[in-house]
Regions:
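A metal-dependent, Asp-based hydrolase signature
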Residues: 50-102
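Active-site neighborhood of HAD-like aspartate-dependent phosphohydrolases
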Residues: 1-53
């Protein structure tokens, strides 16, 4: 597959590992709070984890609410943890908030750059491909990640939901990035881990939607669009 004129990259769980596989992270954290939760064995911890994660999924399933709360993840997490504990009969909101804040801090401390991220982006740039970083989320949080992992100077255009005013999968987001790169949709790839945001929406504009699937989750059962390509490593883009 020949290289395009431009590549738009997602940030979270594409260039950096940020929020993937939350099950293991929640289990680790809930063990720390086991005594406060009166959860004294693995089965009790699992009940709390399931309740918290199911409430989080329900919380984020509302597209309009998600667009609002993506700009304030810590508060959103507090609300969903409160709901998860309340479902189990625990209405201690102060405890729920401490758990949510601890999870936010733990995830922040565990952000990692994918090992082939810099090399892949640099190889594309060296090949003359124009590059944009297009990410949802709050400006301050995303800018901190970009600086922390030395990504800023590697892109011709950086577009953050909290600064631009709209986030993926709004088509205006991709159109604006393409305009800034002065490239037509048919000459561009969108690369990322979110099926709706990096495959379905970009393909509506005529872009190639390249799905990054490092954990081999497979195409979602409900998918109505097929990825232009599936990669398990970023380096596959330039191999």
């Amino acid at each position: 597959m020949p290289l395009p004129r431009a590549v738009l990259f997602d940030l979270d769980d594409t260039l950096i590992r940020a929020y993937a596989q939350p099950e293991e992270a929640w289990t680790r954290l809930l063990h720390i709070f086991a005594a406060h939760l009166d959860a004294h064995d693995a089965a009790a911890i699992e009940r709390v984890r399931v309740a918290v994660m199911e409430e989080a999924r329900a919380f984020w399933s509302d597209a309009q609410a998600a667009a609002k709360w993506r700009l304030d993840i810590p508060t959103a997490r507090r609300l969903s943890v409160r709901r998860g504990l309340a479902r189990l009969g625990n209405t201690d909101e102060a405890l729920a908030d401490r758990i949510a804040d601890a999870f936010t801090e733990m995830r922040r401390n565990e952000y990692r750059l994918y090992p082939d991220a810099h090399a892949t982006v640099d190889a594309l740039r060296k090949a003359g491909v124009k590059l944009a970083l297009v990410t949802n989320g709050a400006a301050e949080i995303q800018r901190d990640k970009i600086a922390r992992f030395d990504l800023g100077h590697r892109f011709d255009h950086i577009q953050i939901e909290g600064e631009f005013g709209q986030g993926k999968p709004e088509l205006a987001v991709y159109r604006h990035a393409l305009d800034r790169l002065e490239v037509d949709a048919c000459d561009a790839w969108m690369v990322g881990d979110n099926y709706e945001w990096e495959v379905v929406a970009p393909q509506r504009l005529g872009m190639c939607g390249i799905w990054y699937d490092p954990f081999e989750a497979g195409v979602p059962a409900h998918a109505t669009a097929k990825p232009t390509r599936i990669i398990k490593r970023l380096a596959e883009l330039v191999e």
